């Protein structure tokens, strides 16, 4: 199931480890410019962020439930960014992926493919999950386990997905996640009843990404920016 016409010969997996949101954002923009110019192959950035709250194009401070000074005192950073969607949280224990791919104008197909990747990963843990019509992301029952929010510029994608692996779910109480007051969030560890590490999930994610997007060759790069990942 491909989201663009030309089959990907090579996908670079660049693991940034644990990295500040602003710095990772800069890496995204640099990589996006290179891919869009044809100077770099399609790339999937993997990263874990310190606590951060981001507001997409539909995001508003009305969905922020905690005082900004309080959040700053707790080590949270806040960012207004160019992805679609509303407000979301990033933090330790969450596996974030930024696929930077030439998708053309097939945005809807691309989003469905991202959902399919996540569904395949969760299935390896015996979990039945699905996308929900009208709501971006992947759900197990009525609980969201993966948030998805993307941006497209020059027909190349950036931003992406955030899978709650062993995330501190209390941090989501500081926001109305994705602006959906009647929905809740969960994590892979909570759903399975055991602590799952990011390092365990990563190869499953890469395999699912390869299968869904029809990638021919995967190249892994250990990034010089990479810091120790929280397990």
Q: What do these predicted ranges mean?
A:
Residues 2-145, 195-196, 225-231:
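N-terminal lobe of the biotin/lipoate ligase/transferase fold
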Residues 53-54, 155, 170-171:
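Short, acidic Gly/Pro/Ser/Thr-rich loop/turn segments
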């Amino acid at each position: 199931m491909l989201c663009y016409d030309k089959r990907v010969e090579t996908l670079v997996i660049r693991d940034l480890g644990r990295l500040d949101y602003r710095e990772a954002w800069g890496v995204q923009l640099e990589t996006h410019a290179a891919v869009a110019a044809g100077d770099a192959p399609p790339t999937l950035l993997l990263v874990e962020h310190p606590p951060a709250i981001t507001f997409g194009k539909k995001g508003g401070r009305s969905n922020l439930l905690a005082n900004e000074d309080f959040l700053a005192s707790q080590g949270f950073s806040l960012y207004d960014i160019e992805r679609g969607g509303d407000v979301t949280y990033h933090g330790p224990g969450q596996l974030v992926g930024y696929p930077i791919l030439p998708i053309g104008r097939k945005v809807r197909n691309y989003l469905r493919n991202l959902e399919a990747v996540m569904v395949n990963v969760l299935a390896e843990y015996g979990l039945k999950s699905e996308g929900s019509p009208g709501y971006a992301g992947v759900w197990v029952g009525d609980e969201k386990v993966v948030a998805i929010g993307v941006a497209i510029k020059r027909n190349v994608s950036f931003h992406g997905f955030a899978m709650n692996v062993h995330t501190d779910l209390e941090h989501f109480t500081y926001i109305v996640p994705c602006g959906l007051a009647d929905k809740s969030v969960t994590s892979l560890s909570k759903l399975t009843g055991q602590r799952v590490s990011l390092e365990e999930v990563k190869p499953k994610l890469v395999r699912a990404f390869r299968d869904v997007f029809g990638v021919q060759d995967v190249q892994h790069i250990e990034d010089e920016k990479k810091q120790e990942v929280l397990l």
